Curated annotation (Swiss-Prot):
Signal peptide: none annotated. [2Fe-2S] cluster binds at residues 95, 126, 186, 258. This is Biotin synthase. [4Fe-4S] cluster binds at residues 51, 55, 58. Pathway: Cofactor biosynthesis; biotin biosynthesis; biotin from 7,8-diaminononanoate: step 2/2. One of its GO terms (molecular function) is iron ion binding. Binds 1 [4Fe-4S] cluster. The cluster is coordinated with 3 cysteines and an exchangeable S-adenosyl-L-methionine. Residues 36-263 form the Radical SAM core domain.
């Protein structure tokens, strides 16, 4: 795997003629994954609103003109009930998100109980709780956490235009703490916040140049929420979004590339192109934290129409190169 990408290389990949880009992405995808399988996760907001951060895209910030109502941390029993329903609906991983800058000790105790309870159902677990230090990641690891989500959101250069209450380096430090604790990393970003080609390339470059590629790479299409600073941001055309998915697949061929927020406004045809470009993971359920997501029956119908099906637990690990394919062949495909 490469960890030495340059911005120029990534910009060149994104800008390839569309048929060539899709060919390279699909070819690499098939070398590591079954292209007919999709990893299914469900995301639940366990603590909504009242966040002290000022992320320009997020309605959970207490600093914006319009914010969602702040709620208390959910009870463990209520979370387990939601996890049971998610498993019944076909999810293999249950993700829990809390609108915190960083969790307090007593809240982390409760989250650890949630992790243990969800794990007992036979589901993988993922949480996103804000910034973590080494001690906090060790506690989560001890509770059995499988994945921790902490997105970079955008390039380091554009980051200051979106967030001022947390530095880019603080995000990287949290990722390092998560990795050092032996927890799988879930890390991606958002397309459509006013960034340019260089910023999109910079985000993918940073992700792919981490010491180890994230096991899961969620790519979000901005959901424009009224009352947030990005509520009237210019929409991104579907082909541009598909190009980012394809480039992420080429640069991080072993990772699960997830279609995250923004799917509610995507057509079936756009979904199909994303899957062809190498996306192999989605969030299932009618809401992602506070924003809408396609209804479960719509996802089932779409996957059925495409001849695709959910991954089983054993298939949901990082991709493994098929024996007939050499590492040199993969690198040549990525850069030629």
């Amino acid at each position: 795997m490469r960890h030495d990408w340059t911005r120029d290389e990534v910009e060149a990949l994104i800008s390839l003629p569309f048929p060539e880009l899709m060919y390279r992405a699909q070819t690499l995808h098939r070398r590591y994954f079954d292209p007919t399988k999709v990893q299914i996760s469900t995301l639940l907001s366990i603590k909504t609103g009242g966040c002290p951060e000022d992320c320009a895209y997020c309605p959970q910030s207490a600093l914006h003109e319009k914010s969602v109502k702040a709620e208390r941390l959910m009870a463990v029993e209520s979370v387990i009930k939601e996890a049971r329903a998610a498993k019944k609906a076909g999810a293999g991983r249950f993700c829990m998100g809390a609108a915190w800058r960083t969790p307090k000790d007593h809240d982390l105790d409760t989250v650890c109980e949630m992790i243990e309870g969800v794990k007992s159902l036979g589901l993988e677990t993922c949480v996103t709780l804000g910034m973590l230090d080494a001690q906090q990641t060790e506690r989560l690891k001890k509770a059995g956490l499988d994945y921790y989500n902490h997105n970079l959101d955008t390039s380091e250069e554009f980051y200051g235009s979106i967030i001022s209450t947390r530095t880019y380096q603080q995000r990287l430090d949290t990722l390092s703490n998560v990795r050092d604790a032996g927890i799988n990393v879930c890390c991606g970003g958002i397309v459509g916040m006013g960034e340019d080609l260089s910023d999109r390339a910079g985000l993918l470059m940073t992700l792919a140049n981490l010491p180890k590629h994230p096991e899961s790479v969620p790519i979000n299409l901005l959901v424009r929420v009224e009352g947030t600073p990005l509520g009237e941001a210019e929409a991104v055309d579907p082909i541009t979004f598909v190009r980012i998915i394809a480039t992420a697949r080429i640069m991080m061929p072993e990772s699960h590339v997830r279609l995250a927020a923004g799917r509610e406004n995507m057509t079936d045809e756009a979904h199909a192109l994303c899957f062809l470009a190498g996306a192999n993971s989605i969030f299932c359920g009618e809401k992602l934290l506070t924003t809408p997501n396609p209804a479960e029956h719509r996802d089932r119908q779409l996957l059925s129409a495409l001849g695709m099906s959910p991954m089983v637990q054993s298939e949901a690990e990082m991709g493994t190169m098929r024996p007939a394919v050499t590492e040199d062949a993969v690198c040549e495909m990525a850069v030629s």
